[in-house]
């Protein structure tokens, strides 16, 4: 477990290449940044990793299990969101000082962490064939208690994972 702050210039290759699996729960300075930085190094060294959800706008997100050259990578997800959110404009939020006013439901973070644990155990223990059965990121919708999954696909032309081979 590493409990240090990460800055843009922080060198992480030596930390990552010496492990078998990485769980990224860093949400500072921003989850998108930490996910991209860590995931690119993990893919380079063919290290499976999990980008956790369960906080802020990702409160009920399942997170992403990324197995290099098998599942969509962080860049595949970024491209997906760029396409899907191309014309999206945020609505003005009714609460002005959100950092003081808005909290989250603990049960949603519990959902995200429990889901992540199950997916991580399945991957590490080899309980499912990830070449055939893996789940992309999902969202638990509290209003109707449903679980929906994104339609992210591995991009064969991805600059990070496209064209690479996975070794079991």
Predicted regions: what is each one?
Residues 2-10:
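Conserved SAM/SAH-binding loop
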């Amino acid at each position: 477990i590493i409990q240090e702050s990460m800055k843009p210039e922080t060198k992480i290759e030596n930390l990552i290449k010496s492990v078998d699996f990485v769980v990224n729960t860093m949400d500072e300075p921003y989850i998108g940044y930490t996910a991209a930085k860590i995931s690119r190094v993990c893919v380079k060294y063919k290290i499976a990793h999990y980008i956790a959800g369960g906080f802020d706008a990702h409160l009920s997100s399942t997170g992403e299990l990324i197995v290099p050259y098998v599942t969509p990578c962080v860049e595949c997800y970024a491209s997906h969101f760029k396409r899907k959110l191309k014309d999206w404009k945020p609505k003005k939020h009714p609460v002005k000082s959100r950092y003081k006013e808005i909290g989250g439901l603990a049960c949603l973070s519990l959902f995200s962490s429990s889901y992540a644990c199950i997916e991580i155990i399945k991957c590490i223990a080899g309980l499912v064939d990830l070449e055939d059965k893996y789940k992309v990121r999902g969202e638990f919708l509290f209003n109707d208690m449903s679980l929906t999954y994104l339609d992210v696909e591995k991009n064969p032309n991805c600059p990070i994972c496209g064209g690479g081979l996975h070794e079991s």
